[in-house]
Regions:
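Active-site beta-strand/loop architecture of penicillin-binding DD-peptidases
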Residues: 1-34, 50, 54-158
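A structural-propensity feature for long, helix-poor, extended segments
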Residues: 40-41
Length: 158
C-alpha cells in the first residue's frame, strides 16, 4: 500500500534496536528507491480508482465506491482504499448459501487497505478482520478510525 501511496517508490524499513540514552545512532534514513516501470499516468489512474472506492457516492445502486456508504461521508481529507473479501471455505460459483449457517471460522475474511491523505501520504495500512465478512462494511471502518486517529481528526462516523 505504501508503494502505491508513494507512486512506485519504496523505502526499505529499518529496525530500531534501542532508543536509550546512549549516544548510539538510532536510524539511518533510507532513500526511496523506484521499483516500478509504471508511468506517472498509470499511478494517477490507480490512485484515482482507489479514491473512488472511498469518495464516489450518490451515483445510485452499485455505482458508488464500495466503501463510500461505510466511511466516505463526513471525511475531511482524501483517502484512497481498496476493499476485499477472502473466501475461507470453497463455495462453488453461483451456489446459494446462508452465511449465518456457516460456522464462525468458515466465514469470509474482511480486508481493507488504504492510505491518506492522497496528495501527501502520511499513513498506509492494511486491515484484516478474520471471519469478519465484507471488507467495506467491516474492515474499512477500522481503517478509517485508525487513519482519523493518526491524522489527529475526531472520529465521527455514522
Amino acid at each position: 500500500v505504501a508503494m502505491i501511496a508513494n507512486r512506485g517508490r519504496i523505502v526499505r524499513p529499518r529496525l530500531v534496536l534501542s532508543r536509550g540514552e546512549r549516544s548510539v545512532p538510532v536510524l539511518q534514513r533510507s532513500m526511496p528507491e523506484t521499483t516500478s516501470n509504471l508511468t506517472e499516468e498509470d499511478w494517477q489512474k490507480m490512485v484515482a480508482a482507489m479514491e473512488d472506492v472511498v469518495h464516489l457516492g450518490g451515483q445510485g445502486f452499485r455505482r458508488n465506491g464500495t466503501a463510500w456508504a461505510y466511511i466516505g461521508q463526513r471525511i475531511g481529507y482524501r483517502m484512497a482504499g481498496k476493499s476485499g473479501t477472502a473466501q475461507v471455505v470453497e463455495i462453488r460459483q453461483g451456489e446459494e448459501y446462508d452465511e449465518e449457517e456457516l460456522s464462525e471460522f468458515s466465514r469470509k475474511h474482511a480486508w481493507f487497505m488504504a492510505f491518506a491523505p492522497v496528495d501527501d501520504p502520511q499513513i498506509a495500512l492494511a486491515v484484516l478482520v478474520e471471519n469478519g465478512g465484507g471488507g467495506s462494511s467491516v474492515a474499512a471502518p477500522v481503517a478509517r478510525k485508525i487513519i482519523d486517529s493518526y491524522l489527529g481528526r475526531s472520529v465521527t462516523m455514522r
